[in-house]
Amino acid sequence: MPAPVPPTAFAQPSGPATQLVLGSMQRAPEYQALLTSLKSAAPPSSSVQGEMVDRILDNATTLPPPPLTIHLVLPLPLPSNLLSAIPPSTQIFIHIPADSESQLGALHSALASHSFTPVLPTPSPSTLAYTSPSAPSLPAVASEPSPAPSSSTPVTLSGARPLQLRRNGDKARKAALWAIDSPLIPDGGKSLLTPADRTRPDCVFPAENGKPVKRRRACKDCTCGLKELEQEEEAQTSAAVQEAQKAFFLEGDDDIPENLKKATEGMEGIWPADKRAEAKKTSSCGSCYLGDAFRCSSCPYLGLPPFKPGEQVQVSIGDDI
């Protein structure tokens, strides 16, 4: 460990200022010795504080407000973000550890890249004195020389950067980003659909607590498509009823099942005898009881003359072939 530097070797701040000693666990004995010597030699108007550098870098605490003098008792190389955190126009004293002469060149380069100014003469061979720039600056980075400003190019102030507007990217990339179809599938994935995927789901409400749920009817000004579904179902039901009504029944209860003897209105069937007189005789073609011949293609009596209700009709075997 190098010989301690007496506190009188450092330039004492003129006026009420704070001296901050930043140390680390690697150099804890030197940190404690320097902090004790500075406190013993500090004037009453000056304040001496000690802090570990990792608390400053982790934002666990902040540096005291200027005017400020900082003593760095740290191993080399210094943390890269420490020099950027030092306030402007602040004098720092870097206490060089022993056996670190090979790293002094990199230390001077790092300080110069952050625009730190050396203070000569140095307090001692093991201590370097520098002053931070008056305005915070970024590390110098080599770049191409900018063209000379012309009449149409505004001159920017020091430290200011012109606003760079983002240009529109490739339109094809934007279209591919929002595309629904994949370019890897020629038909956009339609070939992957099964017939079950293409089937429209039935509008069926499940039972709730064992009770059927009433179906919701479409509004008068429906726009959700429920009205169209209801119209389609009504058309299918009406077509099924019309298909069922095409059946033509003759009077006579020989081959008619019992459940069809009480046919509803609109279908010709076998009614009870007490209601036959009141029943309105109808048929699918509407001509069987109008004195016209049988002309329906599906009628088994096609081509025969008309008969009266209740008349026994006899069909020969030749007519049935």
From Swiss-Prot:
Chain residue ranges for the region called Fe-S binding site B: 285-299
Keyword terms: 2Fe-2S, 4Fe-4S, Cytoplasm, Iron, Iron-sulfur, Metal-binding, Mitochondrion
Biological process per Gene Ontology, one example term: iron-sulfur cluster assembly
Listed InterPro entries: Anamorsin, CIAPIN1
Positions occupied by motif Cx2C motif 2: 296-299
Chain intervals for the UniProt region annotation (N-terminal SAM-like domain): 1-161
Domain of life: Eukaryota
Record flagged with keyword Transmembrane helix: no
Sequence ranges of Low complexity compositional bias: 125-158
Pfam families membership: CIAPIN1
Residue positions of motif Cx2C motif 1: 285-288
A GO-annotated cellular component: mitochondrial intermembrane space
Region named Linker: 162-199
Stretches for region Fe-S binding site A: 203-224
Broad class of the protein's primary localization: cytoplasm
Cofactor dependency: [2Fe-2S] cluster; [4Fe-4S] cluster
Subcellular location: Cytoplasm; Mitochondrion intermembrane space
Region annotated Disordered, chain positions: 124-168
MF annotations from Gene Ontology: 2 iron, 2 sulfur cluster binding; 4 iron, 4 sulfur cluster binding; electron transfer activity; metal ion binding
Positions of [2Fe-2S] cluster binding: C203, C219, C222, C224
Annotated residues for binding of [4Fe-4S] cluster: C285, C288, C296, C299
Oligomer status and interactors: Monomer. Interacts with TAH18. Interacts with MIA40.
Family named by the database record: Belongs to the anamorsin family.
Domain-level remarks: The C-terminal domain binds 2 Fe-S clusters but is otherwise mostly in an intrinsically disordered conformation. The N-terminal domain has structural similarity with S-adenosyl-L-methionine-dependent methyltransferases, but does not bind S-adenosyl-L-methionine. It is required for correct assembly of the 2 Fe-S clusters.
Known role: Component of the cytosolic iron-sulfur (Fe-S) protein assembly (CIA) machinery required for the maturation of extramitochondrial Fe-S proteins. Part of an electron transfer chain functioning in an early step of cytosolic Fe-S biogenesis, facilitating the de novo assembly of a [4Fe-4S] cluster on the scaffold complex CFD1-NBP35. Electrons are transferred to DRE2 from NADPH via the FAD- and FMN-containing protein TAH18.
Name the UniProt record assigns to this protein: Fe-S cluster assembly protein DRE2
Protein's organism: Cryptococcus neoformans var. neoformans serotype D (strain JEC21 / ATCC MYA-565) (Filobasidiella neoformans)
Lineage: Eukaryota, Fungi, Dikarya, Basidiomycota, Agaricomycotina
